């Protein structure tokens, strides 16, 4: 059943990287063409997508087993972090706080507060983070981000557990 993972792990990693780039491009389209402004949690999810894209791309490019596993683990961590942030934002959208304030923007928090205070403020969310401005098949952007981050994490985990064994495209060769 999982033979397709064994036969082309490099292609799967490249596909994960390409999917992340496509998601980032779609986010830019929504921001610059449609006019949706990203909230602080959306921006953090974009950084997680960049991390998954870069690390999965590096894992795909590096054929030596130790390196591809290192990059894949880092991509898995970024995907897990992105899934956490997307899940938190989805929670805020489903159960908005009683008093939703707009709060500071992402860069304002980072520039004006020490990182130890800015990070909790970002994850607390803001009034902007609870807004659902766009949906597809009943899911918000945060919901779909969670699904994609989870898919990336599962694929990366399966690749790591199976160790890239298999066919000519395998990552285990030197």
Curated annotation (Swiss-Prot):
The keyword Cell inner membrane applies. GO terms for molecular function: electron transfer activity; protein-disulfide reductase activity. Disulfide bonds join 39-42, 102-129. GO terms for cellular component: plasma membrane. Keywords: Cell inner membrane, Cell membrane, Chaperone, Disulfide bond, Electron transport, Membrane, Oxidoreductase, Redox-active center, Transmembrane, Transmembrane helix, Transport. It is found in: Cell inner membrane. Residues 30-47, 88-143 are periplasmic. It is a multi-pass membrane protein. InterPro entries: DiS_bond_form_DsbB/BdbC, Disulphide_bond_form_DsbB, DsbB, DsbB-like_sf. This is Disulfide bond formation protein B. The lineage of its organism: Bacteria, Pseudomonadati, Pseudomonadota, Betaproteobacteria, Burkholderiales. The gene is dsbB.
């Amino acid at each position: 059943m999982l033979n397709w993972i064994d036969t082309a792990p490099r292609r799967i990693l490249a596909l994960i990287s390409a999917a992340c780039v496509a998601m980032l491009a779609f986010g830019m389209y929504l921001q610059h063409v449609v006019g949706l402004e990203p909230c602080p949690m959306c921006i953090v999810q974009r950084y997680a997508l960049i991390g998954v894209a870069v690390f999965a791309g590096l894992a795909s490019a590096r054929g030596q087993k130790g390196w591809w596993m290192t990059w894949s683990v880092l991509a898995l961590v970024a995907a897990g972090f992105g899934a956490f942030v997307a899940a938190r934002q989805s929670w805020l959208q489903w159960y908005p706080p009683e008093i939703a304030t707009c709060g500071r923007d992402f860069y304002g928090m980072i520039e004006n507060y020490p990182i130890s205070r800015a990070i909790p403020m970002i994850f607390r969310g803001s009034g902007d983070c609870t807004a659902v401005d766009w949906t597809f098949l009943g899911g918000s952007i945060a919901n779909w981000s969670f699904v994609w981050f989870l898919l990336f994490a599962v694929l990366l985990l399966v690749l790591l557990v199976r160790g890239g064994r298999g066919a000519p495209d395998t990552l285990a060769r030197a």
